[in-house]
């Protein structure tokens, strides 16, 4: 999928940005996010970096109904090796 392609591009020296439409769809790529993007730097002893940005919408809004309004950023924050960024103000 897109996340796997992004991981491969990152390992090849690029700095890809992968967009996932909503955070709930990121669960389909969870294996790649958790077991590859987040762990390859640690498993390689720092020899490999995965400079990948995964951008996704989270929370209610955008008229996407209940199935697409999850807020999983707190859950992702508990995965070692991931950094979670979220705007705090309108200016952000």
Regions found by a protein language model. Give the residues of each.
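Short glycine/serine/threonine-rich phosphate/pyrophosphate-binding segments
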Residues: 1-5
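Conserved thiamine diphosphate
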Residues: 7-92
């Amino acid at each position: 999928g897109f996340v796997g392609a992004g991981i491969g591009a990152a390992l090849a020296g690029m700095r890809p940005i992968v967009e996932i439409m909503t955070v709930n769809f990121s669960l389909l790529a969870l294996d790649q996010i958790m077991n590859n993007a987040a762990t390859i730097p640690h498993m390689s002893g720092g020899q490999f970096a995965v400079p990948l940005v995964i951008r996704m919408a989270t929370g209610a809004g955008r008229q996407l109904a209940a199935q697409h309004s999850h807020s999983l950023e707190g859950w992702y924050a508990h995965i070692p090796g991931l950094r979670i960024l979220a705007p705090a103000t309108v200016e952000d």
